[in-house]
Amino acid sequence: MAEDTDEDAFDGPARTVFLLHGWMDVSASFQFVADLLPANWTLLAPDWRGFGLSERPAADCYWFPDYLADLDRVLDILAPGEPVDLVAHSMGGNVAALYAGVRPERVRKLVNLEGVGMPASRPGQAPDRYREWLDALRAGPSLRDYDSREAVAARLMKNNPRLRPDQAAFLAQHWGVAQPDGRFALAGDPAHRLVNPVLYRVDEVTEVWRRIEADVLWVLSEHANDWHAFVKEPEYRQRLSAIRRLSRATVAGAGHMMHHDRPEAVATLIREFLS
């Protein structure tokens, strides 16, 4: 990811910040925010396994704990032995919040952009979930491809009507991967679309969050997706109370992809919280 940050934005000490993207996304997704962060910050934005430019493991599905191990290894290589700042979106936010509880000594501050977790599951859902997973394995995962990068950009704008054409054109350069037949596939392993056979165990997640020692900024969007309705429920507020040093913010005029919709607002929150 390019680091064309504001040349005049040398506010505060230099620092290293890791930018962690979400599910079916790529690290370049943070470019619009990165352009607005201080020029003396070092920004490191890896692609999760099976996304973007990262390799696809020889497996038929992905296991969430592997992302924790990947993050642990990346930090050991790029920032050994020091607490780091994490800015993470959606799935990346879920990984980062768990990591901050499992390795509390490694995270100084965390900005979580809509990494809200999932609604609580019930044990009675397990039989159908395993069956759904087996059926999906049998059918095999797939993602549609496109005849041009312009078509990829159009798909991105359909998914997010707030996305500007110039933003979509930029993202399509990173999301659209040229194939031997001249078509363009999305930069994500289709196996990521397989349902997780393991239910979301909110009690386990909450216990991990209790061990977070970092300052945490929890950022939601004004126009969250329908499946985010559960964050307004008392049970979810109780869940968040497990995080001891928690601040909250809402980005007005933005949907789930807030770092595309309102990059200026998101960059301001990040800069003020981490500085």
Language-model segments: what does each one mean?
Residues M1-F18, P38-T42, A79-E82, G117, ...:
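Alpha/beta-hydrolase fold catalytic core
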Residues R211-A254:
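Conserved loop-alpha-helix segment in the C-terminal half of the alpha/beta-hydrolase fold
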Residues E82-Q125:
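Conserved hydrolase catalytic core segment
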Residues L44-V87, M91, V251, T268:
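Active-site loop/oxyanion-hole signature of alpha/beta-hydrolase fold enzymes
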Residues V251-P263:
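Catalytic histidine-centered segment of alpha/beta-hydrolase-like enzymes
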Residues D4-D6, F10-R56:
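Conserved HGGG/HGGXW glycine-rich cap/lid loop of the alpha/beta-hydrolase fold
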Residues L143-L199, V231:
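Conserved alpha/beta-hydrolase catalytic His-Asp/Glu region
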Residues L113-Y146:
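A catalytic-pocket lid/entrance helix-loop region that shapes and gates access to the active site
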